């Protein structure tokens, strides 16, 4: 009998639409290779829905809360449904940028400087010398991320709108010039390194998910030793945070500094996108792994107690 896979997608975070796209593509790929698939658009009754479905495996394709912060992982552990990607602790830790940076720095992984500020503090004036980056301490897909430039008298007013939904805690980091590099990890294997070039300057939400919004340059145009250093650090970050299954580490690289000193790890994404424009499927394809094989691997890798 074909394995029954519940594909978890949607949810209520600002990344809902990306999750629905990831889920739809993966569900289709699983059906094509013979799995029995139920698409679950996650709402607050998800525990009841999953208890009724009793799937063999849950493929977690949620982004943001509740799928990326340990919440859905805890529900699946209670229901004893094997699931993909990282477990409760690693998910919660990686979702909190400040705490994840502490862990990675302790493991010897270079991370950017900076500190946490509240929205109220940011509203009063510059919290770092410009240029610097302000982003929600929890969240992904570059949603709510702003670069504050030298010619701006104050941070972007979008941060202080009444309909802001990304929390009161912001991470302020110095802006690091240079290349945007990213590397996926698949189990204990680092995939290849992509250089991301945004068409309109900043690799924001629109650049990530709009057709033609960015270029994925694979392999990245860096020296071989930097390329291998990125792969090594991505795997080390995956392990330091306790990640499982698929993750993706994002880096900035200032090639004007000597001996690779310009390379820093910005963050680790435990639920990287799986849409038609996403990075991990591109990396896998470059390694000879088809999209169907990648999704099948995630299902077969699923366990409890992750």
Curated annotation (Swiss-Prot):
GO terms for cellular component: cytoplasm. Belongs to the D-alanine--D-alanine ligase family. Pathway: Cell wall biogenesis; peptidoglycan biosynthesis. It comes from Azorhizobium caulinodans (strain ATCC 43989 / DSM 5975 / JCM 20966 / LMG 6465 / NBRC 14845 / NCIMB 13405 / ORS 571). Its cofactor is Mg(2+); Mn(2+). One of its GO terms (molecular function) is metal ion binding. ATP binds at residues 128-182. Its EC number is 6.3.2.4. Cell wall formation. Mg(2+) 2 binds at residues 267, 269. This is D-alanine--D-alanine ligase. Residues 101-300 form the ATP-grasp domain. The gene is ddl. GO terms for biological process: cell wall organization; peptidoglycan biosynthetic process; regulation of cell shape. Binds 2 magnesium or manganese ions per subunit. It catalyses: 2 D-alanine + ATP = D-alanyl-D-alanine + ADP + phosphate + H(+). Keywords: ATP-binding, Cell shape, Cell wall biogenesis/degradation, Cytoplasm, Ligase, Magnesium, Manganese, Metal-binding, Nucleotide-binding, Peptidoglycan synthesis. InterPro entries: ATP-grasp (IPR011761), ATP_grasp_subdomain_1 (IPR013815), D-Ala_lig_Van_CS (IPR000291), D_ala_D_ala (IPR005905), Dala_Dala_lig_C (IPR011095), Dala_Dala_lig_N (IPR011127), PreATP-grasp_dom_sf (IPR016185). It comes from the Bacteria. It is found in: Cytoplasm.
